[in-house]
């Protein structure tokens, strides 16, 4: 009986933390989506290793909403000893766990396919929004400067962009070497071609491979927490009358 009470309290505290983290992510996600410029001013340039090629605000909102719901279900289910809610908590966590494993397998086995899929999504956005959408341009400039890269694949991603068509030059990062992220001379297509600066996707992959132990450790830690939460929720479920 004492063991059951202890696990119940731990379940409530753990999920309360998840609930608060979810609320914080939701708030930040809404802030980034509504006023990304003030967010960048408050926190400075985003870390190059944390750059994303998707809309960061919507990603944070989605992640925050999932954590918010999970935390609420875990807290409420454990506190009220509601078997239905505990089963919902377990089921959602199991789906997330399976999706994470599937995503990791796809990322490892089908890297080329993932690159093609992301190219299909990202390159049109570069062609349309780079140089004209403030937050999008700031994120890409921070990424290209921090990682010493150009575009998603390389400089050719800008060939059909509004930025190149109207300004007749490429972003300066496409003509910079690894020691100098800026260039004084205009970055023409010929110069960008001769410099052949690597694309940001390959640079990020290289960073991940370089820090594979850290990335793997974090992934294993998250998976272990999810498994522990599922085991605890099922223990409470099975011991409730």
From Swiss-Prot:
Membrane-topology descriptor: Multi-pass membrane protein
Entry keywords, A to Z: Cell membrane, Glycoprotein, Lysosome, Membrane, Transmembrane, Transmembrane helix
Superkingdom to which the source organism belongs: Eukaryota
GO-annotated cellular components: cell junction; cytoplasm; lysosomal membrane; membrane; nucleoplasm; perinuclear region of cytoplasm; plasma membrane; vesicle
GO BP annotation list: protein stabilization
Glycosylation sites recorded in the entry for this protein: 154
Subcellular location: Cell membrane; Lysosome membrane
Pfam families: Tetraspanin
Residues passing through the membrane, by range: 12-32, 53-73, 89-109, 212-232
Annotated function: Structural component of specialized membrane microdomains known as tetraspanin-enriched microdomains (TERMs), which act as platforms for receptor clustering and signaling. Participates thereby in diverse biological functions such as cell signal transduction, adhesion, migration and protein trafficking. Regulates neuronal differentiation in response to NGF by facilitating NGF-mediated activation of NTRK1/TRKA receptor tyrosine kinase and subsequent downstream signaling pathways. Plays a role in the inhibition of TNFalpha-induced apoptosis.
Family affiliation: Belongs to the tetraspanin (TM4SF) family.
Quaternary assembly: Interacts with SLC19A2. Interacts with NTRK1/TRKA.
Protein name (Swiss-Prot/TrEMBL): Tetraspanin-1
Organism: Rattus norvegicus (Rat)
Chain's gene name: Tspan1
């Amino acid at each position: 009986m004492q063991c059951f009470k202890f696990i119940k309290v731990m379940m409530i505290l753990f999920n309360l933390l998840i609930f608060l983290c979810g609320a914080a992510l939701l708030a930040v996600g809404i802030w980034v989506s509504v006023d990304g410029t003030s967010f960048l001013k408050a926190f400075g340039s985003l870390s190059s290793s944390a750059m994303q090629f998707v809309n960061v605000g919507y990603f944070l909102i989605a992640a925050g909403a999932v954590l918010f719901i999970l935390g609420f279900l875990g807290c409420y289910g454990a506190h009220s000893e509601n078997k239905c809610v505990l089963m919902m908590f377990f089921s959602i966590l199991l789906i997330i766990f399976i999706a994470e494993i599937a995503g990791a397998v796809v990322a490892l086995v089908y890297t080329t396919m993932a690159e093609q899929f992301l190219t299909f999504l990202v390159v049109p956005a570069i062609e349309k929004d780079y140089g004209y959408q403030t937050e999008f341009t700031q994120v890409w400039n921070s990424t290209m400067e921090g990682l010493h890269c150009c575009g998603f694949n390389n400089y050719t991603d800008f060939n059909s962009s509004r930025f190149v068509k109207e300004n007749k030059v490429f972003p300066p990062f496409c003509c910079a070497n690894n020691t100098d992220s800026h260039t004084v001379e205009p970055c023409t297509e010929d110069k960008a071609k001769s410099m052949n600066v690597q694309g940001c996707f390959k640079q990020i992959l290289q960073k991940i491979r370089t820090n594979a132990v850290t990335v793997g450790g974090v992934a294993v830690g998250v998976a272990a927490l999810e498994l522990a939460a599922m085991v605890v929720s099922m223990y409470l479920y099975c011991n409730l009358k």
